[in-house]
Every structure is written in structure tokens, then in C-alpha cells.
């Protein structure tokens, strides 16, 4: 009975997400990623800034209503994102309806079309269900294993709540960019493959991998260095010890951001190559190891809750490495480690050094946390340009995809 408010609060999100996915797919098919990217940012920001106040007010009633407040915030964020997509779709639909039809094209019959859709969608759907299914298993596994590790149940509930409610919520914000990058790769690579344009396919794949590290590395290191400051800015902690443990969890968990970003990009590339089963299998293997490690590590008294981020790091590493191998195999491209990895890593290291020095020199406080975040963004952007991690040639395709969509041209 205590979970009923949560189920009622999250139930509308099921319908909202399905409708929004169809609209996102329409826009992505036109290689216009702006609506998808903005709607995802609306989702993630809404989950943080709407869910938290609702959880606060719900806590005045009971813990169950606090959890329901978080879930209701998710439904509200999905609803606002869907409303945005509907507005954009209505604006764009007239332009696409006005395009002349190709008289040589024969529309597919319902059965072949349905068969083709299912062959593409079933592996993608199963792949998308893997991580939520593992999270569902973890929700019961983590708490029980913390108790098995000798932690009092009340303390275990606090640890689990801070990890799942605080740490994972913050980690999900930058991963929205990873999903946007992945989704932008699918239509462009599929189009190049359909034309037999191997050069463009390899260039887009290389760009996607480069952007994964350009975006993922600074997010991982920046959040890791500023974990305590970011948590203090957004959340309230009853004791310094609670803040310390949560900051350590966030610092370790933030390293999964870059791994998740690369997994998403390589999955997008493979899906564009019509190899959508491969990322499903690699992620399934990673999640299986994650569940096993969670059970083993969290039950150890000396590791306990810290086993959860360690298991996540292992999960995405296991998924990432074979994905990279298959991308190289099926695209035929050579992995330019200097351009794809080393230059972004150098820019990130320089940013990290500046941030570490600034943390020592600047006073603590919410205002100074915002200053540190701004400093990290600005210094990384400067170092990325100076080291060549990001160039004008890299930005041009990104701006074309994210900056303006275009209707498909009629082929003669």
C-alpha cells in the first residue's frame, strides 16, 4: 500500500514518453536534433528542479509521499517536454506535407512495413529495457546487501536514498547530452550507408566518438572534483558525514559519465549501420556483471555502498570495449587516438588542474560553487580549442545538425 502513491504518480509518464518518442523519431529522421536535445534537457532539468520541491513537501506527510513527489516530478517533466515537441511538430508538419511526392516510389504494404519496423524496434526496445530492469533488481538488492554487510537498516535506507536519489539524479543530467549525440548519429550514418558513401560514414563515426570524449571527459572530471560543492549547492545534509559519503559516491559515480557517453555513441553508430543487436548484447553482458558485482561487493563490510558505482564502471567498460571494436570493424575507420582521446584528455587534465587550484584558493559557499562551475566550463572550452580537441571542422557538422534541421530533398 505504501507504494501506491508512487505508482499513481509515475503512471502518466508511460503514455507521455511513448507519444514523445514518436515525435522525436520524426524529427530525427529529418536530421533535426534541436527538438530532441531541448526536450531531453527539459526532462532532466525538470526531474531535478520539479521533483525535489515535490519530494520536500511530500516528506511532511510520509516517506511514501516523498517518493511519490519525485515520481510525480518525472511525469510533469515528461509532460512539459511532450508539449514542447507537439508545438515544434505542428510548426514543421506543414512544410513536410507540402513536399512533392516521388511518383516512382511505391508505398510499402502494411505487413512488410510492420515486419520491417518490428525487426528494427524489437532489438532497440529490448536494449532499452536492460538498464531499467537492472535498476529494478538493484533497488531491492542494494538495500538487502547493505544490511547483510552489517549496516543498520535505518542507516542502509539513508545510504540507498542518497545514492539513488541524489547521486544518480545528478549523473543523469549530463548524460542527456550523450543520448542526444547518439541519436544524431543514427540518421546521418544510415543515410550515408544507404548512399554507399563510406567516407561520410567514417567521418561521422569519428566525429561521434570525438564528441563523446570531448563532452564526457570534462563532465566526469568536473563533477568528480566539485562533488561536495555541487551537493551542498542543491541538497541539504543533516551531518557532515552524510555529505562526505555522498560526495565520495558522486565523485566515483561521475566517472561513469564518459563511459556511458561512449557506449551511447557507439550504440548509435552500430544502429545506423543496422547492427542494432550488437549493442543490445554488449550491454546485456555488462549489466549481468553489474548485478553480480553489486551482490558481491555491497555485501562486503569494507566496501558496502561503494560497490554500486564500482559495478556501474565495470558494466559500461564491458559494454564500451566490444562496441568500439565492432565500430572499427564495420566502418573500416582507423581510430585516431590522438584526436579522439588524447587531446580531449589533455584539455580535461588542464581544466582539472585549474579547478583543483581554484578549490584550494576560493572560499566555500553557494555563490563560489557557481563561480567554480563557470570557471571549469570556460577553461575547458579554451583548452579544448588550444589543444585541438575541438576545431572549426569539428564544430561545423555539429552546428549543422543541432543548429538547423532541413527537410529531405526529393531525389530525381
Give the residues covered by each predicted segment.
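Hydrophobic transmembrane helix module of multi-pass membrane transport proteins
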Residues: 1-133
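Helix-loop junctions and terminal segments of transmembrane helices
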Residues: 175-198, 267
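Interfacial transmembrane-helix starts/ends
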Residues: 114, 118, 164, 197-214, ...
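Helix-terminus/linker motif at the lipid-water interface of multi-pass membrane proteins
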Residues: 57-59, 125, 129-174, 191, ...
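Interfacial segments at transmembrane-helix termini and the short loops linking adjacent helices
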Residues: 1-10, 224-257
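Membrane-interface helix-loop junctions in multi-pass transport and translocation proteins
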Residues: 30, 34, 45-83, 87-88, ...
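Membrane-interface junctions at transmembrane-helix termini in multi-pass inner-membrane proteins
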Residues: 16-39, 255-285
Amino acid at each position: 500500500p505504501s507504494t501506491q502513491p508512487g505508482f499513481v504518480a509515475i503512471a502518466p509518464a508511460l503514455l507521455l514518453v511513448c507519444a514523445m518518442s514518436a515525435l522525436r523519431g520524426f524529427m530525427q529522421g529529418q536530421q533535426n536534433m534541436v527538438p530532441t536535445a531541448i526536450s531531453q534537457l527539459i526532462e532532466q532539468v525538470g526531474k531535478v528542479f520539479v521533483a525535489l520541491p515535490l519530494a520536500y513537501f511530500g516528506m511532511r506527510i510520509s516517506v511514501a509521499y516523498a517518493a511519490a513527489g519525485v515520481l510525480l516530478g518525472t511525469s510533469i517533466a515528461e509532460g512539459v517536454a511532450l508539449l514542447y515537441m507537439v508545438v515544434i511538430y505542428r510548426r514543421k508538419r506543414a512544410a513536410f506535407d507540402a513536399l512533392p511526392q516521388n511518383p516512382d516510389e511505391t508505398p510499402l504494404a502494411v505487413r512488410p512495413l510492420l515486419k520491417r519496423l518490428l525487426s528494427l524496434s524489437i532489438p532497440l526496445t529490448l536494449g532499452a529495457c536492460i538498464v531499467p530492469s537492472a535498476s529494478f533488481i538493484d533497488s531491492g538488492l542494494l538495500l538487502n546487501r547493505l544490511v547483510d554487510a552489517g549496516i543498520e537498516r535505518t542507516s542502509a535506507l539513508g545510504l540507498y536514498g542518497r545514492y539513488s536519489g541524489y547521486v544518480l539524479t545528478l549523473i543523469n543530467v549530463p548524460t542527456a547530452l550523450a543520448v542526444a549525440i547518439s541519436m544524431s548519429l543514427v540518421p546521418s550514418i544510415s543515410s550515408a550507408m544507404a548512399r554507399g558513401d563510406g567516407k561520410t560514414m567514417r567521418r561521422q563515426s569519428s566525429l561521434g566518438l570525438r564528441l563523446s570524449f570531448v563532452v564526457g571527459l570534462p563532465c566526469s572530471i568536473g563533477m568528480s572534483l566539485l562533488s561536495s560543492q555541487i551537493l551542498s549547492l542543491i541538497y541539504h545534509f543533516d551531518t557532515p558525514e552524510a555529505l562526505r559519503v555522498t560526495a565520495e559516491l558522486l565523485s566515483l559515480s561521475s566517472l561513469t559519465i564518459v563511459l556511458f557517453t561512449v557506449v551511447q555513441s557507439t550504440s548509435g553508430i552500430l544502429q545506423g549501420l543496422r547492427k542494432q543487436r550488437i549493442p543490445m548484447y554488449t550491454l546485456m553482458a555488462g549489466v549481468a556483471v553489474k548485478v553480480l558485482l553489486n551482490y558481491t561487493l555491497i555485501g562486503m563490510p569494507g566496501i558496502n555502498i561503494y560497490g554500486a558505482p564500482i559495478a556501474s564502471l565495470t558494466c559500461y567498460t564491458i559494454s564500451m570495449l566490444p562496441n568500439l571494436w565492432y565500430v572499427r570493424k564495420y566502418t573500416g575507420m582507423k581510430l585516431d587516438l590522438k584526436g579522439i582521446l588524447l587531446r580531449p584528455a589533455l584539455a580535461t587534465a588542464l581544466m582539472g588542474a585549474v579547478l583543483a587550484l581554484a578549490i584550494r584558493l576560493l572560499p566555500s559557499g553557494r555563490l563560489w560553487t557557481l563561480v567554480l562551475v563557470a570557471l571549469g566550463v570556460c577553461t575547458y572550452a579554451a583548452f579544448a580549442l588550444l589543444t585541438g580537441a575541438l576545431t572549426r571542422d569539428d564544430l561545423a557538422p555539429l552546428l549543422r545538425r543541432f543548429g538547423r534541421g532541413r527537410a529531405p530533398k526529393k531525389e530525381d
